[in-house]
Amino acid sequence: MEKELNIDWANLSFGYIPTDYNVRCTYKNGEWGEIEVSSSELIPMHMAASCLHYGQEAFEGLKAFRGKDGQVRVFRMDENAKRIQRSAEGIMMPALPVEKFMEMVKMVVRLNARFIPPYGSGASLYIRPLEIGMSAQVGVKPATEYLFVIFVTPVGPYFKGGFKTTPYVITRKYDRAAPLGTGTFKVGGNYAASLRASCEAHAAGYSAEFYLDAREKKYMDECGAANFFGIKDNTYITPLSTSILPSITNKSLMQLAEDMGIKVERRQIPEDELTTLEEAGACGTAAVISPIERIDDPENNRSYVISKDGKPGPLSTKLYNRLRGIQLGEEEDVHNWNTIIEL
């Protein structure tokens, strides 16, 4: 008999809560096997597994939402399937077929349906796929065996304060990724490389660190673990860079901006251009949009105040509400981004 859940849905943090099941698929002898269901939170692993030594690990993040109509929707999972394929291929791992990825997502959501937060709680079911190199070896080369796992956990809003502006800080001491390195892939090493800068930013009272381009330290690159966008003159501007992870949320916001008659530009954004922005935000799966109050540059003793009244800008708010409305079934999904999971 299932144990009754004792979860305060309205006050969930963005953290890990154990659920009932995860799903797994093994790659060996040159092919993917059958999908397996597991109730264990542990992965048996050899101490010489390539993921532990040589960083053969890629992951994704997506969400399932219980909508206004009671239906469960997963947002743009085909895009996550394709992105983890690119990440895997970028570090010489086999790509899981899109169809198998989507089957695994549907399966794990159904198996853990009781953990999907209720509509109106502000919470969602976070879905974490990951692929890791499993074969034991000493020597830098791709593994021969891999494990693909998807687990889920209910999460609250990434930022407890909700949709409000927060400060960011430019760091020049660190680069998140090299211009032609692994920055465009969602691999663990990129996040390990950002931990020191992130911890220093948080300790100084900032929401996240802001990286400049690694080559010239002149252009805005990525803010923490999220993409950056600025708005001015009815134009949505986001960096074009070879070291930034292509955000599915940012891609969606660009489409919604065009739908609203807002011009979209993907180009380099010089730091000096921050003085002209009317609105700015960080965007990603976790927070959707985190509006930026100001961006400090302590090394040059400068502060770029984006939000003069301390509130999110009108277009950022409109884009946020539109995207959230689509995810929750409150607004028409004209681009067919959602997959409805039959429970």
Predicted regions span which residues?
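Short, charge-rich binding segments
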Residues: 114-120, 140-142
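Helix-start/capping segments and mature chain N-termini
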Residues: 1-108, 137-343
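Intrinsically disordered, low-complexity linker/loop segments enriched in Gly/Pro
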Residues: 111, 133-134
